[in-house]
UniProtKB/Swiss-Prot annotation:
UniProt keyword terms in alphabetical order: Ribonucleoprotein, Ribosomal protein
Protein's name according to its UniProt entry: Large ribosomal subunit protein bL33
Organism of provenance: Caldanaerobacter subterraneus subsp. tengcongensis (strain DSM 15242 / JCM 11007 / NBRC 100824 / MB4) (Thermoanaerobacter tengcongensis)
Claim: rRNA processing is one of the keywords in the record: no
Coiled coil: none
Length: 49
């Protein structure tokens, strides 16, 4: 079952990206390095609901 998640910038706490993930294949929280338009640099983004 795929669920909707938001990715939050760890530096400025903005929800910049929304995506889906398969909970069966990825039970842990997703962490990706993505570009934050508010910080104007690549930062670590973590999964939240």
């Amino acid at each position: 079952m795929r669920v909707k998640i938001a990715l939050v910038c760890t530096e400025c706490k903005n929800r910049n990206y929304h995506t889906t993930k398969n909970k069966k294949n990825d039970p842990d929280r997703l962490e990706l390095k993505k570009y934050c338009k508010h910080c104007k640099k690549h930062t670590l983004h973590r999964e939240t609901k």
